[in-house]
Regions:
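A short, conserved beta-to-alpha structural element at the edge of catalytic cores
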Residues: 190-215, 225-226, 232
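Cofactor-binding active-site loop characterized by glycine-rich and histidine/acidic residues
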Residues: 34-189
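N-terminal capping segment at the start of a domain
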Residues: 11-27, 200-202
C-alpha cells in the first residue's frame, strides 16, 4: 500500500471506530473524529518521526497517582521512546481521546483490545484523556494548557541539543483562551522553532459555533502578529497536511491551521447543525439514521 492510501486507510479507520463506539455508548465525541481524522492520520503516518511503541499493547489498569508511586507512567510510550533525534507528540484537547486511541490502534501502536477498556472504571483508556492515558503525556483537561507546558519541554530539548521536533495537536476553540496567546507569545520570544502545532479548525465549541461565541478570526494574521509562522490548509487533504510541516520557520514556531468539516465522512450528522460538540442521541431517530449510515458505509466492521 502506498503512503497516500495508508494515510487514507487510517483516517477511515478512525472515523469507523469512533462511530461504532458512539453507537454502542449512546453518544460520544464523534464530530471531533470527523474533523481531525486526516490530521492525526497524516501526523502519524507521514509527518512525525516516532520510534515504535514501548508501551504494553493492552493498556494496564490505572496504577495510582504520581508522587511516591514508583510505577507511575504516562501514556507517552505509545508514541515511542524519548530520544534526542525523535519527535514527540502532545494532544491538547483531551476530549479527543477516543480519536487518538483509534489512531493508535490503526497505526499498530495499541492493541484493539485496548479500545474495549474505554471509559471503564480503574482503567487508563479514559473518555477525557489524562497523562496516563495511551498516547497522552500531559494533563490538559482545561483547554489551552498543553501549549504552555510544551514550551518548557521544547526549551529543555533545545538546550540539550536535541534535534527532535515537538508536535502539538490543538483545537481552534483553544484560541478563545488567553493562556493560548500567552503561550504563543512566549514560543516566539524564545524562538522555539522546534514546536509545530496542528490546529483542527472545525469552527465548533462546546457552546456552539466559535464565531458566535468568541470570534478568533482572522486566525492566521493574529498568529503572525504574535510572531509565529502560520499556514492554512484543507484539513482533509492529506498531501497538503503533510507538505505544511515542511514550511520554513527558522526561529519561529509553526502553526498549521487545518480548516475542517465537523461531519466529514459521516455526512448524516449534518442535520444536527450546529449541535456537534457531543453527539447525544435524541428521540428523533438520530441513532437509527447513524446505524443505517454505518451499515451502508462500513458493513459489519467494528
Amino acid at each position: 500500500m502506498n503512503p497516500l492510501d495508508e494515510t487514507r486507510r487510517v483516517a477511515d479507520g478512525i472515523r469507523r471506530r469512533v462511530t461504532a463506539f458512539t453507537l454502542k455508548n449512546g453518544g460520544g465525541y464523534l464530530s471531533q473524529a470527523c474533523s481531525s481524522a486526516e490530521i492525526l492520520a497524516t501526523l502519524y503516518t507521514r509527518v512525525m518521526k516516532l520510534g515504535p511503541s514501548v508501551a504494553p499493547p493492552v493498556p494496564p489498569p490505572f496504577g495510582g497517582v504520581p508522587g511516591k508511586n514508583p510505577n507511575y507512567a504516562t501514556g507517552a510510550g505509545y508514541n515511542g521512546p524519548h530520544a534526542p533525534e525523535l519527535d514527540r507528540f502532545f494532544i491538547s484537547p483531551v476530549h479527543y481521546a477516543l480519536v487518538l486511541y483509534a489512531t493508535l490502534v490503526e497505526t499498530g501502536r495499541m492493541a484493539e483490545e485496548g479500545l474495549a477498556m474505554f471509559n471503564q472504571d480503574g482503567g487508563t483508556v479514559e473518555m477525557i484523556g489524562a497523562e496516563h492515558s495511551p498516547g497522552h503525556e500531559l494533563m490538559a483537561g482545561s483547554l489551552g494548557q498543553a501549549l504552555s507546558q510544551v514550551i518548557g519541554i521544547a526549551l529543555g530539548r533545545r538546550r540539550k541539543g536535541e534535534t527532535g521536533r515537538n508536535f502539538v495537536f490543538m483545537s481552534d476553540g483553544e484560541f478563545m483562551i488567553g493562556q493560548t496567546w500567552e503561550a504563543m507569545e512566549t514560543l516566539s520570544f524564545y524562538e522555539l522553532d522546534n514546536v509545530i502545532a496542528y490546529v483542527d479548525a472545525n469552527g465548533q465549541s462546546a457552546d456552539g459555533k466559535i464565531d458566535e461565541v468568541m470570534g478568533i478570526e482572522p486566525l492566521k494574521e493574529r498568529l503572525e502578529a504574535f510572531g509565529a509562522v502560520a499556514v492554512e490548509v484543507d484539513g482533509h487533504d492529506v498531501e497538503a497536511l503533510a507538505a505544511a510541516a515542511e514550511t520554513p520557520h527558522e526561529g519561529k514556531p509553526l502553526v498549521v491551521i487545518a480548516r475542517t468539516n465537523p461531519y466529514c465522512g459521516v455526512e448524516v450528522l449534518a442535520e444536527r447543525a450546529p449541535r456537534f460538540h457531543y453527539i447525544r442521541f435524541t428521540g428523533s431517530g438520530e441513532k437509527e439514521a447513524l446505524e443505517r449510515f454505518y451499515a451502508e458505509k462500513w458493513g459489519g466492521r467494528k
